Amino acid sequence: MNGSVLPSRGRVTINQVAEAAGVSKASVSRYIGGDRQLLADATARRIERAIDQLDYRPNQMARGLKRGRTRLIGMLVADILNPYSVAVMHGVETACREHGYSLVVCNTDRDDEQERHHLAALQSYNVEGLIVNTLGHHPGELRALHRELPMVLVDRQLAELDTDLVGLDNADAVEQALDHLQHRGFRDILLVTEPLDGTSSRIERVQAFNASIGRRPALKGQVLQTDDFFRDGLRAFLSASGPGPKALFTCNGVATLCATRQLRDLGCRLFDEVGLLALDELDWYPLVGSGITALAQPTDEIGRTAFERLLARLEGDREPARRVTFPAQLIVRGSTHPRG
């Protein structure tokens, strides 16, 4: 082996490995491409020594592109600061790693132009499939991309896309919440949600809430969005007379944080004057007062399942689009202690 070929800096190339081993570039390509059985044992040993000496790392992206495979999965999220998105992303990334894929995450920060930019970027990265948890304000671009590669939606249905969806069973979660609150003696329920903004999961929860309240004559219910009028609406709810003890049902972690801050600022004693049940389970819920009762979403399983559906499509599954939903798990804490 010619041991004099040692690059002083920069990325080691396949040509340098071939020169150091005294073999052709094609032989090195066969070696790193898994076709070592085509090489003489002595040739393979020289290539191995050269790779070790030069600390050569094959460019996996380039190798993948030559074979039509990058083993990259794209994930588009609306808000990377949202704990739900982070938790689902963890499940997706874990499943990707277990199957030999890498995850490329793009955060739109709820910005329409960023969403458009990231869709173009992900396409340029040659991702093999895409997982989408975003506002979907560019259905044309999403449809065009879906014609080229498989796509799975998380949490939010986009009417323009006929593709798999993985998320929570929203109707069941609302039923669990109202069953628990009613059993604990609450009668006046305020559902708190982020602005609907066409987001299917938020709309489904509001619709399920209104329908369930309509079937429960003992309960009174109303809906309040966390917009500029939220503080005034919350104050009005707390001060109004009603059929009995009051409770808030917050539809996600962001709404829960907003509601607890406003309750504190309004001087409301948590959780003596009003009960609270939150959808999503966040690390800080047990730390507030006597703890916030929660409906935990199986975020890790949702993320894993989203990747598994995408993998099935990559492997040739051509069945009609499926909706895979999971039930929430009720975790009871002091915020919904029984009322007389």
Swiss-Prot record:
One of its GO terms (biological process) is negative regulation of DNA-templated transcription. Negatively regulates glucose metabolism by binding directly to the promoter region of the kgu and gad operons. It also negatively regulates its own synthesis. Keywords: DNA-binding, Repressor, Transcription, Transcription regulation. The gene is ptxS. GO terms for cellular component: protein-DNA complex. It holds the Pfam family LacI. Residues 12-67 form the HTH lacI-type domain. Interacts with PtxR in the absence of 2-ketogluconate. Binding of the 2-ketogluconate effector to PtxS causes PtxS/PtxR complex dissociation. InterPro entries: HTH_LacI, Lambda_DNA-bd_dom_sf, Peripla_BP/Lac1_sug-bd_dom, Peripla_BP_I. GO terms for molecular function: DNA-binding transcription factor activity; DNA-binding transcription repressor activity; transcription cis-regulatory region binding. 2-ketogluconate acts as a molecular effector and causes dissociation of the PtxS/PtxR complex. Disruption phenotype: Mutant exhibits a twofold increase in exotoxin A production. This is HTH-type transcriptional regulator PtxS. Induction: Expression is enhanced by the global regulator MvaT, which binds to the ptxR-ptxS intergenic region. Negatively autoregulates its own synthesis by binding to a specific operator site within the ptxS upstream region. Residues 14-33 bind DNA. Contains an N-terminal helix-turn-helix DNA-binding domain and a C-terminal domain that binds the effector. The keyword Acyltransferase does not apply.
